[in-house]
From Swiss-Prot:
Cofactors: Fe cation
Pfam families, A to Z: Lipoxygenase, PLAT
Reaction equation(s) it catalyzes: a hydroperoxyeicosatetraenoate = a hydroxy-epoxy-eicosatetraenoate; a hydroperoxyeicosatetraenoate = an oxoeicosatetraenoate + H2O; (12R)-hydroperoxy-(5Z,8Z,10E,14Z)-eicosatetraenoate = (8R)-hydroxy-(11R,12R)-epoxy-(5Z,9E,14Z)-eicosatrienoate; (12S)-hydroperoxy-(5Z,8Z,10E,14Z)-eicosatetraenoate = (8R)-hydroxy-(11S,12S)-epoxy-(5Z,9E,14Z)-eicosatrienoate
Keyword presence, Cytoplasm: yes
Stored PANTHER family: LIPOXYGENASE
Entry's Gene Ontology cellular component terms: cytoplasm; membrane
Pathway: Lipid metabolism; hydroperoxy eicosatetraenoic acid biosynthesis; Lipid metabolism; sphingolipid metabolism
Name assigned to this protein: Hydroperoxide isomerase ALOXE3
Length: 711
C-alpha cells in the first residue's frame, strides 16, 4: 500500500471555499490512483484553509504527471464555486510535487493539473501530456473567443461567449459575433446617479477567472457612487451653459484635491509648466526633436527672436537639437460631435518648443491647423496674454484627445487585452511564458469590458464629454493603430527615435528606462533558463502560435508595423516580453495614474471646445474664453471619469509582486527575488530624488505601479 499525502490550500477571496465534494485522482507513469474523496472531520475547503488528506494506492505510481480534481454535488446544495490556490503532493519516498492552481473551479467538473515545473511543448514527449496540452488549449479557445469591435481596431474578447458557457458544456469556437455597430443596444440604459448610459448585459457575464474580486468590485463602486451622486445632488451633472468664472471649477471636487492637482491649478497658465507636461505629464511621448522645420509650420527667426534672446537664432537652436515639435496631425480629419445639442470643434495643432539654456522646455509657437495661411495664424508668447492662453488651451484639448484615445486606451488597454487573450488561448498553464505573463494580464479583460460598457457604448461617457464622440474615437484609434510601430512600443527605441535622450528633468524617461532595464534583466534570466538556444525558440510551436496570434489579432497582420509574427532567437523573445510587461504595468501607470492630478483643473485638459479656433489675433476676452471651454455638465462628467480611473481600487498587486506561485523551480524563484530587490532600489532612488523637486514625479515608483492594466 502506497500513501500519498495531499496538502490543499483554498484561496482567501470572499466565498473562495466550497461545500461541494472534492475528489482527487493521481496519475503517474506507472498507473493512476482510485478516485478518492478528500474528506476529514469538520468543514473541508473553507476560505483560506490549508488542509491535509491521504490518497492510498495499491502500489506506487512512479513519476506524478497529473492531478485530477473532481468537483461534485454535496447533498441537496446548489453548486458552489471553489478557488483552489495550490496542492502539494508528498510521495511515499518523501519528495514533494507542487501543483499550482490559482483558479476558480465552477460547477461540477473535472480539472487536470500538471506539476508546477514549467515545460515547453518540445520538452513533453509522453502522449498523455501532449494530449493534455492540446485539450487545455482547445477548451480555452472555446471559452475566450475573439470579436471585432470596429474596423481597424485590435480584436477584443467576446463576452457573450461567457454567457453561453456552462462549466460542463462548451460551445463551438467558430460561432461568429457581430461588430460593435451591429450590437443590440436594448440593454444600454441610464442608471440612477450616472450621467451616461451603461451597457448592462455585457457586465453580467464574466468568466470567474478574469473578473474582478469582490474586494475590487466593492472598492470601485465605493469610489464611483459617492462622487457621482454628490455631483447629481448639487445639480452639476445636469447644469448646461458656460462657467461664469474660472474659480468656480475649483469647487467641483473640493474634497478630492491632491498636491499635484493644486499645483496644476496654480501654475497651469505658465509656459514653463506647459512645457513640463510634455515631459512628465500624462502624455509624455509626444515630443520629437527637429533638425529642420516642417514646411507646414513656417515659423521665422524674427517671430521667436524675442524669446530666444541675443547670441542665438532659430537655426542655431535647431542645429543644437534644442527645438522640439508636438504634432497632432491625427486630429486633422477626426469626425466632430455635438454636446448638449451644440456643435463642437477640433483642431490639429502644431506646437513648437524650445529647450532654453536653463534646461526649461518652453512653447515657442503654436499653429492651430496643419495648413498654414492667413486664416491659421501662428500664435507666439509675445502675443496678447489671452490669445496665447487660448492657443495653449487648444493644444491641451488636442493633448486630451490623443492621450485618452491613443496613448492611454489604445496602446495600453486594448493592446494589453490582445496580449491577454493570446496568452490564454495559445499557451497552456505549464508553459513558462504563460507563467511569466499571467500576473500582468490580471483583470485586464474585466476592466476593458467595463470601459466598453460605460465609455465606448452609444451615449456612453465618450459621447457625453468629448468633442469627437464615439465615431471620432473609433477613427482616432483605428488611424493610430495603422501608424503604431514596434519602435513606438519599445521605450528605449522610442526615446532614441524621437531624439529625447538628453533633455534634462525628463523623469518619465529616466524612471522608465530603469524599470525597463529591471524587467529586461528579469525576463532575460527566465528566458535563458527555459530557452538556452535559438532552436528552443524556433521549435516551440505554442510560442510561435502565440506570437502569430498577437500579430494577426492585435496588429491586424500589418507588416509595416514592425511587430514580429515569428520569433527566432532568445534575444528577440526577451525584448518582446520586456515590452509587453512594461506596457502592461509601468507604461499604463505613467499615462493613467495622473489623470485626476493633471485634469482636475479642467482648463488644463478640456475634453471639448465649443467655439471654432481663432483665425485672427487680438479678439480673445475672458468671456469668449469661457464660452470656448466645455459646459458645466460636460466638465463634471469628465472629471468624474478622471477621479475614478486615478483611484486604483483595492486588491492591488504592485509591479514584481507575485503572491500566486506559478513558478516552482528554484532558478526562476531566485530571479523573482532579484527583480523585487532591484525594484525596491529604484523606488528608493525615485523617492530620494522627489524630495528635492517642487513637483514630485511618482507615477513610476514601483510600489505605485500595478502589475497589470486593471483600472
Amino acid at each position: 500500500m502506497a500513501v500519498y499525502r495531499l496538502c490543499v490550500t483554498t484561496g482567501s477571496y470572499l466565498k473562495a471555499g466550497t461545500l461541494d465534494n472534492i475528489y482527487a485522482t493521481l496519475v503517474g507513469t506507472c498507473g493512476e490512483s482510485p478516485k478518492q474523496k478528500l474528506d476529514r472531520v469538520g468543514r473541508d475547503f473553507a476560505t483560506g484553509s490549508v488542509q491535509k488528506y491521504k490518497v492510498r494506492c495499491a502500489s506506487e505510481l512512479g513519476e506524478i504527471l497529473l492531478l485530477r480534481l473532481h468537483k461534485e454535488r454535496f447533498a441537496f446544495f446548489c453548486k458552489d464555486p471553489w478557488y483552489c490556490s495550490r496542492i502539494c503532493v508528498t510521495t511515499p519516498d518523501g519528495s514533494v510535487v507542487h501543483f499550482p492552481c490559482y483558479q476558480w473551479i465552477d460547477g461540477y467538473c473535472t480539472v487536470e493539473l500538471r506539476p508546477g515545473t514549467a515545460r515547453t511543448i518540445c520538452q513533453d514527449a509522453l502522449p498523455l501530456l501532449l494530449d493534455h496540452r492540446k485539450r487545455e488549449l482547445q477548451a480555452r479557445q472555446e471559452c475566450y473567443r475573439w470579436k471585432i469591435y470596429a474596423p481597424g481596431f485590435p480584436r477584443m474578447v467576446d463576452v457573450s461567449s461567457f454567457e453561453e458557457m456552462e462549466s460542463d458544456k462548451k460551445f463551438a469556437l467558430t460561432k461568429t459575433a457581430p461588430c460593435a455597430d451591429q450590437d443590440d443596444n436594448s440593454g444600454n440604459r441610464y442608471l440612477p446617479g450616472f450621467p451616461m448610459k451603461v451597457d448592462i448585459p455585457s457586465l453580467l457575464h464574466m468568466e470567474p477567472n478574469i473578473r474582478y474580486s469582490a474586494t475590487k468590485t466593492a472598492s470601485l463602486i465605493f469610489n464611483a457612487l459617492p462622487a457621482s451622486l454628490g455631483m447629481k445632488i448639487r445639480g452639476l451633472l445636469d447644469r448646461k451653459g458656460s462657467w461664469k468664472r474660472l474659480d468656480d471649477i475649483r469647487n467641483i471636487f473640493w474634497c478630492h484635491k491632491t498636491f499635484t492637482s493644486e499645483y496644476v491649478t496654480e501654475h497651469w497658465c505658465e509656459d514653463s509648466f506647459f512645457g513640463y507636461q510634455y515631459l512628465n505629464g500624462v502624455n509624455p511621448i509626444m515630443l520629437h526633436c527637429l533638425s529642420s522645420l516642417p514646411s507646414k509650420l513656417p515659423v521665422t527667426n524674427d517671430m521667436v527672436a524675442p524669446l530666444l534672446g541675443p547670441g542665438t537664432c532659430l537655426q542655431t537652436e535647431l542645429e543644437r537639437g534644442h527645438i522640439f515639435l508636438a504634432d497632432y496631425w491625427i486630429l486633422a480629419e477626426a469626425p466632430v460631435h455635438c454636446l448638449n445639442g451644440r456643435q463642437q470643434y477640433v483642431t490639429a495643432p502644431l506646437c513648437l518648443l524650445w529647450l532654453n539654456p536653463q534646461g526649461v522646455l518652453l512653447p515657442l509657437a503654436i499653429q492651430l491647423s496643419q495648413i498654414p495661411g492667413p486664416e491659421s495664424p501662428i500664435f507666439l508668447p509675445t502675443d496678447c496674454e489671452l490669445d496665447w492662453l487660448l492657443a495653449k488651451t487648444w493644444v491641451r484639448n488636442s493633448e486630451f484627445l490623443v492621450h485618452e484615445n491613443n496613448t492611454h486606451f489604445l496602446c495600453t488597454h486594448l493592446l494589453c487585452e490582445a496580449f491577454s487573450m493570446a496568452t490564454l488561448r495559445q499557451l497552456p498553464l505549464c508553459h513558462p511564458v504563460y507563467k511569466l505573463l499571467l500576473p500582468h494580464t490580471r483583470y485586464t479583460l474585466q476592466v476593458n469590458t467595463i470601459a466598453r460598457a460605460t465609455l465606448l457604448n452609444p451615449d456612453g461617457l465618450v459621447d457625453k464629454v468629448t468633442s469627437i464622440g464615439r465615431r471620432g474615437l473609433i477613427y482616432l484609434m483605428s488611424t493610430g493603430l495603422a501608424h503604431f510601430t514596434y519602435t513606438d512600443f519599445c521605450l528605449p527605441d522610442s526615446l532614441r527615435a524621437r531624439g529625447v535622450l538628453t533633455i534634462p528633468n525628463y523623469h518619465y524617461r529616466d524612471d522608465g528606462l530603469k524599470i525597463w532595464a529591471a524587467i529586461e534583466r528579469f525576463v532575460s534570466e527566465i528566458v535563458s533558463y527555459y530557452y538556452p538556444n535559438d532552436a528552443c525558440v524556433q521549435q516551440d510551436s505554442e510560442l510561435q502560435a502565440w506570437v502569430g496570434e498577437i500579430f494577426a489579432q492585435a496588429f491586424l497582420g500589418r507588416e509595416s508595423s514592425g511587430f514580429p509574427s515569428r520569433l527566432c532567437t532568445p534575444g528577440e523573445l526577451v525584448k518582446y516580453l520586456t515590452a509587453i510587461i512594461f506596457n502592461c504595468s509601468a507604461q499604463h501607470a505613467a499615462v493613467n495614474s495622473g489623470q485626476h492630478d493633471f485634469g482636475a483643473w479642467m482648463p488644463n485638459a478640456p475634453s471639448s471646445m465649443r467655439q471654432p479656433p481663432p483665425q485672427t489675433k487680438g479678439n480673445t476676452t475672458m468671456e469668449s474664453y469661457l464660452e470656448t471651454l466645455p459646459e458645466v455638465n460636460t466638465t463634471c462628467s469628465n472629471l468624474l471619469l478622471f477621479w475614478l480611473v486615478s483611484q486604483e481600487p483595492k486588491d492591488q498587486r504592485p509591479l514584481g509582486t507575485y503572491p500566486d506561485e506559478h513558478f516552482t523551480e528554484e532558478a526562476p524563484r531566485q530571479s523573482i527575488a532579484a527583480f523585487q530587490k532591484c525594484l525596491a532600489q529604484i523606488s528608493k532612488d525615485i523617492r530620494a530624488r522627489n524630495e528635492s523637486l517642487a513637483l514630485p514625479y511618482a507615477y513610476l515608483d514601483p510600489p505605485l505601479i500595478e502589475n497589470s492594466v486593471s483600472i
